[in-house]
Amino acid sequence: MRKRIFLTLGHQYYFCAKISSMPIPYEASLDYAQGEDRMDTLYSFRERFLFPQHNGADVTYFCGNSLGLQPKSVEYLMNKELRDWARYGVEGHFQATYPWFSYHHFFSERLAKIVGAEKDEVVAMNTLTVNLHVLMLSFYRPKGNRYKIIMEAGAFPSDQYAVETQVRMHGYDPNDAIIEITPQAGAHLIEDADIINAIKEAGDSVALVMIGGVNYYTGQFFDLENITRAAHSVGAYAGYDLAHAVGNIPMELHNWNVDFACWCSYKYLNSGPGGVGGIFVHERHGNDPTLFRLGGWWGNEEKTRFKMQKGFVPQKGAASWQMSNAPVFNMVAHNASLDLFDKAGIKELRKKSLKLTGYMEYLLQQIKHLPFEIITPAEPGRRGCQLSMLFKEKGREVFDALTQNGIVADWREPNVVRIAPVPLYNTFEDCYRFYEVLSQIK
């Protein structure tokens, strides 16, 4: 792993990496920000998105961790599907530009690059919490003394509800069956070591470790590789909600031996409100027909799907967890956005993201008159692009003032303003504008 060092020298802030012999200075100036934008090889991707308007101008949008912007190509692709439906009717399942029978196949290779998987290990389907329930029916199979689930305290509420009700469905008391790992006294973040130690301490009572890959509130990225290794060492499965990780941080789910994961697509993947979710199932499970999964005709092997026979025969891979055919209109935006990711490359996006978020962090550290602290990890490798500002007071007033000045951020109770400089469409000048407006709020 590359080591990064942060130094403050005078009015400049330096981001240093082992791969560079010269530090890169950050400066709180418009000239600096615009200069960085001129050198940004990904800058043109900004022009491929539609921005909401405020007083006749584009807003400064830092809310991609809640809902990503609309790619301009969505309208064209949606109209294309509508035309194909009008032109072909039912024959569109095989004659449409993207034949609907095999529509989900067009997504797998591109998603696999983003999450570090084999293409048969991923599929776009359903929505996040639906997928979490579906996957837990396969991977949470409590028996005897092995029935406990380890998760982080303060997980996104939908994850909490899913885990709680799955535990109840199996006849267990959530207060006994769910082990929540909390931050140490006085801290905001959960240490990876504390999760790993809790797994080892609980030992063979653990059936499943279920963590949010990036915590929605703090923006902390957990060490999924070592958490997975710890889970496997006690005979438990490891699964992850990657809602805030997918499209944000490159991952290696296959190489990390993750058992399963699920995500939404409407945040960093820019696939529209309520957009289709996705799942990862490691090939050792996806190719095991004896592993229980709920059946549906789209999970059945394709060659016998329309023979209408009794007996569910799962196809190989994550696609066998599908139940129904792809919701084409709901997946159009996903198709458009994944094309942009394929062109930009997740690793190149991450390189820009590290510097862009580092610049925003530096600018926030220059604000001395407002009572907030950044609770997101300072180490770049432990976060994505989100920074969470925890306000001691006046937080909602500051958030409202940002909104009134054409800046779209995100408010999360209690008392946090979340901002996410997304490398596909945010710029260094955006970061400077945020700093400029925030500096003037009293």
What residue spans do the PLM features occupy?
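Pyridoxal 5′-phosphate
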Residues: 15, 19-442
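Basic polycationic patches enriched in arginine
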Residues: 2-4
